[in-house]
A protein has these predicted regions:
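An N-terminal hydrophobic leader/cap segment in hydrolases
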Residues: 1-23
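A short loop-to-beta-strand scaffold at the N-terminal edge of the catalytic core in hydrolase folds
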Residues: 30-40
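Short beta-strand element of the alpha/beta-hydrolase
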Residues: 45-54
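The serine-hydrolase catalytic nucleophile loop
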Residues: 55-67
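Conserved alpha/beta-hydrolase
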Residues: 69-88
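Catalytic nucleophile-loop/oxyanion-hole region of alpha/beta-hydrolase
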Residues: 88-102
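Conserved acidic catalytic loop of the alpha/beta-hydrolase fold
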Residues: 99-119
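Gly/Ala-rich beta-loop-alpha elbow adjacent to hydrolase catalytic centers
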Residues: 123-127
Length: 129
């Protein structure tokens, strides 16, 4: 497997053939679902996971970072929470609680291989609760 050699090189990553998009399985008390993520860039030591507001908002207002993060070679992840834009839409309001959303973010973090040595969380509104 080839290792990425530059900021925009997706070689050797499980999202190499999807332009950075990855659907991540999420396990909840109401069933199993998938949430949408998209990685931009390649930087093993500087990553940001973007947490949007809501419930029900989308990643789209974070797209402004496309004008800033690449210049600093920061790897970043868009993520639509369950019931948002490209993620599954169970339309079950019992899933809209802080504890469940925290668990969802933890499942996303683990699946993406993010840990305290390489990631920062950036949340707005509901995303920073």
């Amino acid at each position: 497997m080839k290792t990425a050699t530059s900021y925009l090189d997706y070689s050797g990553r499980d999202d190499e053939m999807t332009g950075g998009v990855k659907m991540i399985p999420i396990h909840t008390a109401a069933g199993d679902f998938k949430v949408w993520t998209k990685r931009v860039g390649n930087n093993p030591s500087m990553k940001v996971l973007l947490l949007h507001g809501g419930p029900g908002m989308t990643h789209e207002y974070f797209e402004a970072f496309d004008s800033y993060f690449p210049k600093s070679e920061i790897e970043y992840y868009y993520y639509d929470q369950l019931d948002s834009k490209y993620s599954d839409q169970p339309n079950d309001s019992s899933l809209w609680n802080v504890e469940r959303y925290v668990d969802e973010v933890e499942q996303v973090r683990r699946d993406l291989g993010l840990d305290s040595s390489n990631v920062y969380l950036l949340g707005l509104s509901w995303g920073c609760v």
